[in-house]
Amino acid sequence: MSSVRRPSKLLSEKQSDKLAQIIQNFFLKAAHVIFHFRVAFPSVVLQPDDSYGAMGDSFAQSKYNNRWFNLDLGNYEIPRTELSLWRNKDILSLPPLVLETFLDLRGLSSNQTLMLDDVIVKTSKKSEIVLERWLIEFDLSTFDNEVMEFPSIYKKIIILFRSLYLLAGLLPSYKLRDKLVKSKSKNSAIHVSCRILDGSKPITSKGRIGLSKKLLSEDEHTSSKKLQPILTPIGALRVSVSYRTNCNFQVSDNEEALSSQFMLDHLPSVRTNYDSDGNSLTSPMDYLQNRVSSASIHLSDQSPRRRSSTRSVQLFKVGSINSSSSPPPGATQSNQSVSSFSTSKPIPVTLNKTNSSASLVPILRQNRDSLPKSIGSMVQNQMQETGHQVSSNSRRFSSSFGSRFRTVSSRNNSLDGQLVVANQPFSTPNNPILHNFRSRNKSPSVSSTELGPSSSIYMDDDLDSFMKMLDSKPDLRFPSNSPSVYEDPLANFKTFQKSNDFLTLEQQQHGSPSSNQIMIHSQSQTSQSQVFKRTVSSDRSRRGSVSSNYSPSSQALRPGVSAPMVTPSVTYGKFHASSGSPSNSSLAQYLRHNSSPPASATAVATVHNSLRRLTSSSQRTNTNSTNSSTRPVNPELLKLKSFNEDVFESDDDEHDEHSPRSTDTKSRNTGPSSGHAEDDEDDLLFAMSDMTLAKNNQEF
């Protein structure tokens, strides 16, 4: 059995589930017990037209009774929407559960007055009076690793719930609720109700009378109780309550309140309670004004000494409205008075009700520690003694004494000091069982009270799934790191560079060209490469129309300057001189004669004749090649042969062109035939290029 109690032993998966179920039902059952004693159930007083505020009419009848922790409270339960935060399976992120019991004043009419022990309570612009506040929390900083037997934990919780059941029935708020339920007027103007709050958020007293505000001149108007915590291997279950000690509220009409004071002169004891100077109240109006003016403190302000004592009480009055105008905590005198009040230990002092406040002065001077203070201030005092300071972002959870420096609308309640302790961020304790439990339940590393409003307790799971999705996808390649984008343009550039080097070498073999030719050659490289590709790919389409596939540029149509740009196309023939191609010298000579500025009519006629003979020879060659039974002859070869003959004949005709006879003809026909001569020369040049490239294509 000793091995079971070793701290090093971890919880199994089944044990973790059982422990989580126990802790979750602890929150739900505690809320059910408190509501059972604070809210009137439908079977008791609720009618179809009744309105009981927050939770009075929101109970639902369940199919089965909740018998957790050996306590059966009937088949009425709190709606699931009210406890949705505490029904979460992740128990490590459960926020503190706060149950607030309040007196609803919304039903009070203008001719009704709320009274507490025959004292009129000012309820203007107030709709609620907080009666008590319960705090249920799961503290991860306190644990016991040796408590590994869950039946023992369950039995301890049963004892705690019996104590809670007994305590909830003994508090003053339950007596008030029981009195209102048993009263003859079921439709009373006031009723007790309860609400559920998230303890991780600030609790303000805007529009209501908070728990820290006094309604009578009592030494202590609030008290607190704490039940023994239940230790588990991963944390401690705690229950505490802060409540008003006097809840004798009742509703009276304004006329009844005045008529009941006509016999005050015959009651000296009552008269001295309200008239400390011995002066009798002759009229009910004087009595009413005196009661209203001294509702919080029954002291007269006729003597200066009494006025000074009144100011002292107001200075240390917890949650006082008049104390909100005190200087800020940066003042030296205020800090001294606050520190002397908060760091001292309470000394019980009994103040008797007398008709004079002179005896209060030495008591207040000697024993300022006897003034009533709230639970939150006591918790803050303990934190100051241990050297801990509340962070600046937790000032909204300061004690009720700190409400002196705030407005009435932002004044917090007296239980905020406990919420500071519960919600202060602390480092995760060195608890191996807690770490094992967190890993099994996949809970986050921090509780939900430390997360922001936009945070999710399943954020880690979403992040893991996102990372797995990224790992399953292949790596992305960015364009800046990939050289494949530039492969095609680089290959084209290298091809153009090779052709440029080839043409440059060819021109150097024939001699250095002039600057004008170099410029024209550089401008026509792109068009020549495109012409060469189209010639190789479309052989048959050129037979019908020679000039359709080779569209000359705007520079090639000009005579003289544009003629040399065709030279690289013509000089391809020098690589195939053995196959019958025209020689370079004859072609160069022809181009030199042809590039002269004037063009004669004889040259034009010669060009026309050569084209006709070229066409007829091509047709005869095609006919003979079709009828022959031997190997078909390539028509391009025949076309090239006839073209060579025409070129030599036209060259001879040009030598005869220098005679006087031809000169006269030239002078007569220059004008009308100049336009036709340019077109014929262009056709001839393209025909020559066609023949030369076709020959090269055949050799390839």
From Swiss-Prot:
PANTHER family: AUTOPHAGY-RELATED PROTEIN 13, PTHR13430. It comes from the Eukaryota. InterPro entries: ATG13, Atg13_N, HORMA_dom_sf. The gene is ATG13. Residues 506-532 have a biased composition (Polar residues). It holds the Pfam family ATG13. Disruption phenotype: Leads to derepression of several genes involved in xylose catabolism including PDC1, DAS1 and AOX1, and subsequent increased ethanol production from xylose. Residues 428-487 are annotated as: ATG1-binding. Residues 332-344, 595-631 have a biased composition (Low complexity). Hypophosphorylated form interacts with ATG1 to form the ATG1-ATG13 kinase complex. The ATG1-ATG13 complex interacts with the ATG17-ATG29-ATG31 complex through direct interaction with ATG17. Interacts with VAC8. Residues 399-407 are annotated as: ATG17-binding. Belongs to the ATG13 family. Fungi subfamily. This is Autophagy-related protein 13.
